[in-house]
Amino acid sequence: MRAVIQKTVGAKVDVVSEAGTETCGKIDGGFVVLLGVTHSDTEKDARYIADKIAHLRVFEDEAGKLNLSLKDVGGAVLLVSQFTLYADAASGRRPSFSQAAPAEQAQQLYLRTAELLRGHGIHVETGRFRTHMQVSLCNDGPVTILLDSFMTRISPKMKVVPD
């Protein structure tokens, strides 16, 4: 599971259709998280990503150090599904998305990640799965962090959330 986490002072996601544009998620401050799911992802990956999002210390404390977490500052998450995080553009000019999980599996783990974040006491807004969306945000910092739960399988230094 991959997550691109962007610290924001405000963000929204609109669903675009023939009927028009509808805002389906909006936050005043916290993280915009673009979330991609691959074939081998499980509940364990969702727990790892949700725990990291809740506890990453990238908000400034009184001394100006990045020492506070999303939970510490009462921030929210705008969670947006993003299968293109598993694009392979190594050869040719058209990326392959074969590493992205099938829609049913991806949606289940996407919703589970949102549920786990809520379990941490975090307010979560979401995009709408399998729709064309427009994400608007104002980056803060900017701070952008890439998480990949696969790294927990190959690096002994990576901390894995217990079962």
Swiss-Prot record:
The keyword Thylakoid does not apply. GO terms for biological process: D-amino acid catabolic process; tRNA metabolic process. It is found in: Cytoplasm. It comes from the Bacteria. A motif (Gly-cisPro motif, important for rejection of L-amino acids) lies at residues 141-142. One of its GO terms (cellular component) is cytoplasm. It is an enzyme of class 3 (hydrolase). One of its GO terms (molecular function) is tRNA binding. Keywords: Cytoplasm, Hydrolase, RNA-binding, tRNA-binding. Its main location: cytoplasm. The keyword Ribonucleoprotein does not apply. CDD domains: Dtyr_deacylase (cd00563). It catalyses: glycyl-tRNA(Ala) + H2O = tRNA(Ala) + glycine + H(+); a D-aminoacyl-tRNA + H2O = a tRNA + a D-alpha-amino acid + H(+). Its EC number is 3.1.1.96. Homodimer. An aminoacyl-tRNA editing enzyme that deacylates mischarged D-aminoacyl-tRNAs. Also deacylates mischarged glycyl-tRNA(Ala), protecting cells against glycine mischarging by AlaRS. Acts via tRNA-based rather than protein-based catalysis; rejects L-amino acids rather than detecting D-amino acids in the active site. By recycling D-aminoacyl-tRNA to D-amino acids and free tRNA molecules, this enzyme counteracts the toxicity associated with the formation of D-aminoacyl-tRNA entities in vivo and helps enforce protein L-homochirality. Belongs to the DTD family. This is D-aminoacyl-tRNA deacylase. It comes from Neisseria meningitidis serogroup B (strain ATCC BAA-335 / MC58). The gene is dtd.
